[in-house]
Every structure is written in C-alpha cells, then in structure tokens.
Amino acid sequence: MDELEDGALSNGDNLSLPSAGTESWPTSATPGLPPSLLSTLDPTHLGLPEQLASVTVPIRLDTLSYLLHSALLGTYNLQQSLPPCSCTAQPSHIWPDTVRRPPRRSGQARGGWEVRRRPSRGWGRGRGRGRVWAQSQRGPERAEERERNMAGEPGAGPSTPPVTPPSQDGQKEAGGLSEDWEADY
C-alpha cells in the first residue's frame, strides 16, 4: 500500500496539500512558471523560520469580510485626509482633446435627452393633464379620438368594430380589414 502512495507522489498525480509546517510545495506542481518566479522571497530573508513562512491559517468569512472592510475604509479615510491635487483645484484645466459638457438640468437625462414625465395618476390630479400629455405624445387626432371614446359611458372603452357581412364564399373580405386597421393605426 505504501508503494502505491509513493508511486502516485513521484508521478505528480496526487495534488493534495502538504500539511502545515512540513514540506513545501514541489516545484513540479506548477510547471509553467520558472523557478526564479516561484520563490522570489526566501522565508529566511523575512526573518521567519521556514516552517512559519508557509502556514495556512483558517479564518471565518465574516471575520475576513470585516478585516477587508476595515482596511478599505481606512484607505478611504486616509485618502480623504490628504490635501487635494493642485490640478483639480483649477476649473479651467482641460485636456486638449476633451469637450466640456454643460451641467445637466433637472429635466434632462444622460446624454442631454429631455425627460418627459408622465402625469401622476394619484389623488388630487385632474384628468386634463393626461390629455395634454397624450396630445403632445401622440398628436391631436389621437387625443380627440380618445376624448370621443370617453364621452360615452363612464368607464366604457372603445367600441367594438362593426362586423362586416360575409362575402359570397362565407369568409370575411381581407381587403376591408386591412383598410380599417391602417386607418386606426
């Protein structure tokens, strides 16, 4: 049994982790890197014993998250405490190939597009604003058609289209339907 394990280790098939404090990784485990890049810092140069230089320490994820967050927050606070760069204090400093954009107004989206807000359907708003919006968005003809449809019963939607009489074959005429559709839309 020991011979099988020794054979697997010598072939490089077993990639299990070495236990902490024992032998280090074999250089054949990462064949793509040259040996000079594998161990640029010798553990003895750091002033530590060789066994402590490659110790794996288990850490909980919430603890690691806290440590990383604290380090990032400390870096951010340090950056905020430094004096600002002198080049950002000059508002006229512009790179030659950039164009300054005017500041965005409250009714503009990114890129300078105008933002049209739909009317509120909440309490205290009249229906007149909705018609103004519909007229500006879809043209006066559609707004008038909508007003005619709403003038009937309250809550009544558009009336159903009239049924066309069947032709000689007992089928509806295709030409009549397409003309009505084009007129509506």
UniProtKB/Swiss-Prot annotation:
Keyword Transferase: no
Major subcellular location class: nucleus
Compartments, as annotated in UniProt: Nucleus, Nucleoplasm
Disruption phenotype: Mice are viable and healthy but show male sterility due to defects in spermatogenesis. Male mice display atrophic testes and the absence of spermatozoa in the epididymis. Transposons are derepressed due to DNA demethylation.
Biased composition (Polar residues): 11-25
Comp. bias (Basic and acidic residues): 139-150
InterPro entries per UniProt: C19orf84
Pfam families registered for this protein in UniProt: C19orf84 (PF17703)
Keyword list, A-Z: Differentiation, Nucleus, RNA-mediated gene silencing, Spermatogenesis
GO BP term (any one): spermatogenesis
Keyword Nucleus among UniProt keywords: yes
Bias (Low complexity) ranges: 26-38
Region ranges (Disordered): 1-38, 93-185
Biased composition annotated in UniProt, kind: Basic residues: 118-130
UniProt function note: Protein adapter involved in piRNA-directed transposon methylation by connecting PIWIL4-piRNA and DNA methylation machineries. The PIWIL4-piRNA pathway plays a central role during spermatogenesis by directing transposon DNA methylation and silencing, thereby preventing their mobilization, which is essential for the germline integrity.
Oligomer status and interactors: Interacts with SPOCD1.
Name of the protein in question: piRNA-mediated silencing protein C19orf84 homolog
Native organism: Mus musculus
